[in-house]
Amino acid sequence: MSRPRKRLAGTSGSDKGLSGKRTKTENSGEALAKVEDSNPQKTSATKNCLKNLSSHWLMKSEPESRLEKGVDVKFSIEDLKAQPKQTTCWDGVRNYQARNFLRAMKLGEEAFFYHSNCKEPGIAGLMKIVKEAYPDHTQFEKNNPHYDPSSKEDNPKWSMVDVQFVRMMKRFIPLAELKSYHQAHKATGGPLKNMVLFTRQRLSIQPLTQEEFDFVLSLEEKEPS
């Protein structure tokens, strides 16, 4: 598989442990508040809770050129489509909570491909997880902007998953539109009232509830607000 330089390192620009079973309507923002924040010393209880956090995701990447340590980290949904079998590894995540979300992903789960840190951020398409978490090779590559000299091959810190393009959204769903629904839903109790995209906006890997995922998909059929 080719190894394009890409991805946000776990946190992004300002565009931005659970017990028992989660119900489909449990809010991802509320769930996140119960998960330890960016701490490498996760307890086994917290790790087990993360596994039940979500089965839908939002994953951010930068569609416009930006040099990081001399390397262009641009990677858009069009770049994903151009990969062999429209599949690639989602590398470069360097935030513990985002990494733990990667480790919680299961084969076949769907994720929104979100264009971030660009002129018009928003949801561009859908992809699916085709390989569960395994060590991120870029942490060991000295010339890679995501190289981590503190990570050892016999005990790697960072993980990645493989993703495959599913389809483009029927229309691009911009951040501004999602934000307008989020603000309205905070008052009415609607599906996006605590969407992590707004409550923890700097996180590059974000869980979605079933309700949030379904609502965002429904926006494809509506005229832009």
Swiss-Prot record:
One Gene Ontology cellular component term attached to this UniProt record is: nucleus
Region described as Disordered: 1-47
Instruction: Tell where it localizes.
Output: Nucleus
Biased segments, Basic and acidic residues type:
23-39
Keywords for this protein = Nucleus, Phosphoprotein
Chief site of localization: nucleus
Q: Where is this motif: Nuclear localization signal?
A: 5-10
Post-translation: what modifications? Answer: Phosphorylated.
Q: Does the UniProt entry include the keyword Phosphoprotein?
A: yes
In terms of InterPro entries, this protein maps to: 5hmC_binding, EVE_domain, PUA-like_sf, THYN1-like_EVE
Source domain of life: Eukaryota
Pfam name, any one: EVE
**What PANTHER family has UniProt attached to this entry?**
THYMOCYTE NUCLEAR PROTEIN 1 (PTHR14087:SF7)
Q: Say what the protein does.
A: Specifically binds 5-hydroxymethylcytosine (5hmC), suggesting that it acts as a specific reader of 5hmC.
The protein depicted here goes by the name Thymocyte nuclear protein 1
